[in-house]
Amino acid sequence: MSSLTAPITLLSAVTATGASKAVQADAGQPAFLQVSGITSATVALQGSLDGTTYATICTALTADGIVTIANAPKYLRANCTVYVSGTITAKILY
């Protein structure tokens, strides 16, 4: 996979818990997740080596912001793990 020059949307105006579809990143390269629209919710960046078993790989966001990882695993996804209110969008660049 080659690095993206523009972010792609993983979560688009979601109003419930749930994970996005995974993207295949450049393993070992940096990745950036930007989340907006959080009023009362938690969004985690999750990674996987096999595309099946996912784990949260950095601090989950409870307010709008950006998380950065220096060495991405092969697969990445955004997961809204707690939802109370907000209209959440998550975009990734890797």
Question: What residue ranges belong to the model's regions?
Answer:
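Tryptophan-centered short beta-strand motifs
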Residues: P7, D50-A60
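Edge beta-strands of jelly-roll/beta-sandwich modules across compartments, strongly enriched
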Residues: S2, Y83-Y94
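Exposed aromatic-hydrophobic patches
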Residues: K21-Q24, D64-A70
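Aromatic, loop-rich ligand-recognition surfaces of beta-strand-rich domains
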Residues: A19-V35, L93
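Conserved Ser/Thr-centered positions that define the repeating blades of beta-propeller domains
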Residues: Q46-S48
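Noncatalytic modules at the cell exterior or secretory-pathway interfaces
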Residues: Q29-L33, A70-T87
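Transition segment at domain starts
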Residues: M1-D26
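Acidic glycine-/aspartate-rich tracts in secreted/extracellular proteins
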Residues: I38-A41, D50-T52, V82-S85
